[in-house]
Amino acid sequence: TIDLEHQLNQSMKNKEIFTLLGLEKSLVYFTTSLKANKIVIQKLMRNSTFLKMYEDDQDLLEDVLIENKQAIEMAEIYSHILSGMMNTFSSVI
C-alpha cells in the first residue's frame, strides 16, 4: 500500500482509485473467507469427541485458530486504512 500511496500522491488519476477499489474488494473477500475458516476451526475443536484427536492435534488447532484470528485482524486493519486513503483522495479530487 505504500507504493500505491506514493503513486496516488504523484498523480491522482482514476486508475489509482480503481486500483484501491480492487484492493479493498479483495480484502473484503479475504476477511470473509478467514471468518468462515474461523467457524470451521472452532467447530473442529468443539467436536473433538467425534474426531479422534491427540493432544498435539488439539494444540495445532489452537495455534491455527490464533493465527487465523490474527489474520482477520490484519485484514480488517488494512481494509480500514484503504478506506481512509480512498476517502482522503476522493475528497481531494
Enumerate the predicted regions with their spans.
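Membrane-associated alpha-helical segments
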Residues: 2-93
